[in-house]
Amino acid sequence: MKYLLPSAAAGLLLLAAQPTMAANTGGYATTDGGDVSGAVKKTARSLQEIVDIIEAAKKDSSGKVVKGGAFPLVITYNGNEDALIKAAEANICGQWSKDPRGVEIKEFTKGITILGTNGSSANFGIWVVNSSNVVVRNMRFGYMPGGAKDGDAIRIDNSPNVWIDHNEIFAKNFECAGTPDNDTTFESAVDIKKASTNVTVSYNFIHGVKKVGLSGSSNTDTGRNLTYHHNIYSDVNSRLPLQRGGQVHAYNNLYDGIKSSGFNVRQKGIALIESNWFENALNPVTARNDDSNFGTWELRNNNITSPSDFAKYKITWGKPSTPHINADDWKSTGKFPAVSYSYSPVSAQCVKDKLANYAGVGKNQAVLTAANCK
């Protein structure tokens, strides 16, 4: 199914669903980003202007570099790169070899928020490195160049306490012959790696992406706490996420059109997969390509309750030649520990019926509650 997400003007129902405190991310992250007392607020029209604003915020009024940043920062991005996105769409197989374009938030801990205006768009990524207290909201990322050079839409490296909320990330789920492994047409939507932890990924609309996201860059990069909630994934291939160790809590997400595999829980990680909606999915929950250190999962209150539901929701399973475990009996294999935050999941049916009104850009950061499910 192709999802058409309404804009903020599409209905009054969005007005009654504003979030409370920004730090209530519904997940492990507990950050307001730069939206705190003493913040400096700037507007940027381009990638370069965002870069310049961030670099200036690393120095005090005397020009001295301040470790972690001189002040909290809120950047409103109102640029439009639809022309670049359209050109990339017309030349899909020409994108992977280009140089990646991106804003690097590096060694900034004072707090930073990048907020896109409605109608803005970006053909560049945001890469968070050795930073913390970062929020990215209402940004529309399309057809990132530089797939062969790690041109992710969002990359989080060595950075705790990050919130990725109400964005749209899209590409083309397509293999271009001649690229390495025929799979570097585009890189990831959201990669979280290298000791990053306490990250919340919420209310994003991610579609047409082949490799959605990593939790960990290698079998030694393990041990993080991540929450994915109220995201829509449509026409994607795999890595939802590819989890190397640690804890992943995924609730109230909609998965439609998984072409290869969904959750891939490796390196003795554990995932709580709760109150989600799955349909048209191949291997939605699995552990594979990991020798013997398979992870475990707890399945709770999803639309699928037993293998008897697979045909109804078009769930299928493949058996690779390498060692693997599929959730094809739809039974939990582990018990997830108590989470450190409060949250109120709605039913999986409500996710199916209502989430498109809330996920993605142009929604004024509206949230889905039980009151909106009626």
Swiss-Prot record:
Enzyme active site: R239
Domain of life (superkingdom): Bacteria
One MF annotation (Gene Ontology) recorded for this entry: metal ion binding
Cofactor: binding details: Binds 1 Ca(2+) ion per subunit.
A GO BP entry: pectin catabolic process
Keywords recorded for this protein, A-Z: Calcium, Disulfide bond, Lyase, Metal-binding, Secreted, Signal
Any one Gene Ontology cellular component term annotated for this protein: extracellular region
Pathway this chain belongs to: Glycan metabolism; pectin degradation; 2-dehydro-3-deoxy-D-gluconate from pectin: step 2/5
A Pfam family reported for this protein in Swiss-Prot or TrEMBL: Pectate_lyase_4
E.C. number: 4.2.2.2
Statement: the UniProt record of this protein carries the keyword Iron: no
Obligatory cofactor(s): Ca(2+)
Reaction it catalyzes: Eliminative cleavage of (1->4)-alpha-D-galacturonan to give oligosaccharides with 4-deoxy-alpha-D-galact-4-enuronosyl groups at their non-reducing ends
Signal sequence segment: 1-22
Subcellular location: Secreted
Enzyme kind, highest EC tier: lyase
Entry's family note: Belongs to the polysaccharide lyase 1 family. PLADES subfamily.
Function: Involved in maceration and soft-rotting of plant tissue.
Entry protein name: Pectate lyase 1
Provenance organism: Pectobacterium atrosepticum (strain SCRI 1043 / ATCC BAA-672) (Erwinia carotovora subsp. atroseptica)
Gene: pel1
